[in-house]
Regions:
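N-terminal amphipathic alpha-helix/helix-capping segment at the start of soluble metabolic enzymes
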Residues: 1-19, 268-277
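N-terminal small/glycine-rich loop or linker at the start of catalytic domains
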Residues: 7-26, 55-65, 191-206
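Structural preference for beta-strand elements that scaffold enzyme active sites
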Residues: 16-20, 47-53, 89-91, 109, ...
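Glycine-rich, proline-tolerant flexible connector loops at the mouths of alpha/beta enzymes
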Residues: 23-32, 50-72, 236-247
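Alpha-helix-loop-beta-strand connector modules within alpha/beta enzyme cores
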Residues: 38-46, 65-91, 126-132, 182-194, ...
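Active-site-adjacent loop and "lid" segments of alpha/beta metabolic enzymes
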Residues: 65-73, 111-116, 172-176, 199-225, ...
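Catalytic beta/alpha-barrel core
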Residues: 69-71, 85-99, 108-121, 132-143, ...
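Catalytic alpha/beta core domains of metabolic enzymes, predominantly
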Residues: 129-130, 134-236
Length: 277
């Protein structure tokens, strides 16, 4: 299996469980820096490698009137502060091919949103930056179908690819996670990350915005780690009820440390007693 490194944080192989985490969207400069610092403090105590993630533009919000973020220029400036002042690797998403090059100047890895996981020009542009690419699996795709998206990246000479499971559409306004997806994705030869919080969205289920079921974060995250994923993706907020995006499915900051304590123990058992599936 290919091992992927994002700013010194390793995914796959014999690396310990890694975490990609942050707020869904950059809400303000002060909030982003404060939250990043507090997340780093917690992950450092638990010895969990951290990649910080926040979006500068949520281009696929349900409603035209929903908060999208500060935009690319201001967003990248804020992420650059997080990177250099806190020493954290940065991952953020792009929605257009023209965003790839400027984002790659700041971010240590580029993310392809699940809704855009088949957009060839976007994937090729991300690959050509030479940065690691985190491919979110579309909510409409079978695990094995991600081999075609992976091939679009590797065909450009970039072997640094991660695939992230974020649930599959299950009727209207609902998602589910099929645990069989994790071993199937690992057979594609790339590290696998589990996006727990997005998997708990109820898309469009709250009158123009997505609802969510954050109460299931602990069991889903535990199951994913037990299934042998290489990393977890968590949206984290210090006050989810006031979050400007994805609050209903976000992990409350004050619940992060006990969650990581549990997950680290599970990961240690998986890594020391069995080969990852």
């Amino acid at each position: 299996m290919e091992t992927v490194t994002i700013g010194g944080v390793g995914f796959g192989g014999n690396h310990r469980l890694a975490l990609i985490a942050g707020p869904c969207v950059i809400e303000s400069e002060a909030h982003t820096l404060s939250l990043a610092k507090r997340i780093k403090t917690i992950t450092s105590r638990q010895n969990v490698p951290l990649v910080f993630k926040a979006s500068f533009d949520k281009a696929n919000r349900t409603s035209l009137h929903s908060f999208r973020g500060p935009g690319i220029d201001e967003g990248l400036r804020i992420l650059d502060r997080v990177k250099h002042e806190l020493g954290l690797p940065i991952l953020t998403d792009i929605h257009e091919a023209t965003q790839a090059a400027p984002v790659a100047e700041i971010a240590d890895a580029l993310q392809i949103p699940a809704f855009l996981s088949r957009q060839t020009d976007l994937l090729l542009a991300a690959a050509r930056t030479g940065r690691p690419v985190n491919l979110k699996k579309g909510q409409f795709l079978a695990p094995q179908d991600m081999r075609y998206a992976i091939a679009k990246i590797t065909a450009s000479g970039n072997s640094q690819v991660i695939v992230t499971e974020r649930g599959v559409t299950f009727g209207y306004n609902n998602l589910m996670v099929d645990m069989r997806a994790f071993p199937q994705l690992r057979k594609l030869g790339v590290p696998v990350v589990f996006d727990v919080t997005h998997s708990l969205q109820l898309p469009g289920g709250a009158d123009g915005v997505s609802n969510g079921q954050a109460e299931f974060i602990v069991p889903l995250a535990s199951a994913g780690v037990a299934a042998g994923v290489d990393g977890l993706f968590l949206e984290i907020h210090d006050s989810p009820s006031k979050a400007k995006s994805d609050g209903p499915n976000a992990c409350p900051l004050d619940e992060l440390e006990p969650l990581l304590q549990r997950l680290v123990r599970i990961d240690e058992v998986v890594r020391t007693t069995t080969a990852r599936v």
